[in-house]
């Protein structure tokens, strides 16, 4: 499995007994089922939707996220990609732009 570039996150994950260290056939089957379920459900989303994607993510590839996003019929949907982010953005060394984008998106829709 890919590991974050943040040294503190690497240490944390290496000591986490539940962190997936290898991808098995069962893992890939579960991902395939989840992907098809996500695509089917995407077509039913009509509420405001913010979709964020790390372009270095190898677990949820950007093309698959974009495919799901394109199926969302909501009239208020936003897709933001981050070139430097991987899958787990909470492990990013600097996630200030992501946090700013999320807060701005929520504030723009707050009453």
Protein language model annotation of sequence segments:
Residues 47, 61-70:
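Short alpha-helix in the alpha/beta-hydrolase fold that links the catalytic acid
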């Amino acid at each position: 499995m890919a590991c974050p570039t943040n040294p503190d996150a690497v240490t944390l994950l290496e000591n986490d007994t539940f962190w997936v260290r290898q991808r098995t056939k069962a893992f890939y089957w579960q991902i395939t089922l989840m992907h098809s379920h996500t695509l089917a459900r995407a077509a039913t989303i009509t509420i405001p939707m913010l979709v964020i994607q790390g372009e270095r993510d190898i677990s949820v590839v950007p093309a698959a996220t974009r495919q799901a996003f394109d199926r969302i019929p909501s009239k208020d949907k936003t897709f933001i990609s981050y070139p430097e982010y991987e899958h787990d953005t909470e492990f990013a060394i600097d996630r200030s732009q992501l946090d700013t984008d999320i807060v701005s998106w929520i504030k723009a829709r707050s009453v």
